[in-house]
């Protein structure tokens, strides 16, 4: 939770607000850490409730806006798809061992960013799914699969295409700044402001969700007595994420993700027979 859960999320908020509103990352870090502390330590759930209510609507509006950008630049879509595959698999500029290294880096960053998007294989979303009030675990698991599809295949693909067809990937902007510039190009300053605010809500709600993940794990491993210390560390690292260098924050997050994924994937492998048996039983009963 100290990487993907708070530092990268806070860094995205800081980058978005700095790009759209010229707000200093340090100021953003103080405010985000304060709001996070009010919810995590102070139990002020109204802030979390507002984010929870706004995020679904913003997600719909954001997706519609990105789709509108694709429609405005629909003549560039074939070139966009071509550029994606050429940059991913072309080895024109390198050869031999260097070509293999380039391919390895492309796959490595693709997998790393995909994991950041959907948390697949980390075992984190299971904490929330297991707390749901459902009679059939298979049904809940299928919803988890759909979440990955909707988030990565739909929203992330639309975002990437919107950035490419609008040309903002060549502007020198980083991170959230590319999406903001894409929306500003299509809808003016209001579009950029909307994306900045939407990213802030998306990321802040993710921070709160990951704080819950971490609290449950600390409570399970060490008991309630250390939860307070974890909460303070989590809030502090959230502020650090806002002022940290983008590449450093992402590298730390990728490392932490790997440390979570390895033991979880091993456990999934050993439990796969049980999962297959439960799934086959569920399909047999509902078909």
Task: Name each region found by the language model.
Residues 132, 144-149, 199, 234, ...:
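Transmembrane helix-bundle signature of multi-pass membrane transporters/permeases
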Residues 1-30, 79-104, 169-187, 218-221, ...:
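Inter-helical loop and helix-membrane interface segments of multi-pass membrane transporters/permeases
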Residues 65-83, 91, 95-98, 130-132, ...:
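Extracellular/periplasmic helix-exit of transmembrane alpha-helices
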Residues 1-4, 30-41, 59-70, 157-166, ...:
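Hydrophobic core segments of alpha-helical transmembrane domains in multi-pass membrane transport
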């Amino acid at each position: 939770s100290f990487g993907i859960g708070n530092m990268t999320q806070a860094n995205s908020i800081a980058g978005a607000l700095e790009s759209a509103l010229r707000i200093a990352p340090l100021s953003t870090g103080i405010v985000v850490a304060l709001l996070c502390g009010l919810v995590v330590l102070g139990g002020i759930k109204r802030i979390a409730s507002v984010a929870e209510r706004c995020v679904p609507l913003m997600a719909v509006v954001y997706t519609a806006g990105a789709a509108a950008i694709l429609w405005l630049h629909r003549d560039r879509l074939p070139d966009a798809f071509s550029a994606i595959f050429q940059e991913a698999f072309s080895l024109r500029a390198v050869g031999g061992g260097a070509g293999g290294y380039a391919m390895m880096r492309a796959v490595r960053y693709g997998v790393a960013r995909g994991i950041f998007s959907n948390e697949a294989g980390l075992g984190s979303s299971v904490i929330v799914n297991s707390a749901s009030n459902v009679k059939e675990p298979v049904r809940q698991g299928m919803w988890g699969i759909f979440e990955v599809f909707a988030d990565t295949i739909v929203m992330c693909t639309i975002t990437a295409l919107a950035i490419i067809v609008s040309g903002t990937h060549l502007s020198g902007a980083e991170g959230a700044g590319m999406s903001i510039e894409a929306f500003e190009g299509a809808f003016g300053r209001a579009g950029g402001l909307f994306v900045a605010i939407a990213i802030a809500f998306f990321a802040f709600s993710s921070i709160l969700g990951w704080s819950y993940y971490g609290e449950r794990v600390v409570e399970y491993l060490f008991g309630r007595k250390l939860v307070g210390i974890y909460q303070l560390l989590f809030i502090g690292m959230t502020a650090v994420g806002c002022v940290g260098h983008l590449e450093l924050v992402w590298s730390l997050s990728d490392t932490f993700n790997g440390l979570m994924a390895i033991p979880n994937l091993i456990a999934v492998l050993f439990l796969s027979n049980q999962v297959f048996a439960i799934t086959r039983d569920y399909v047999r009963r509902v078909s």
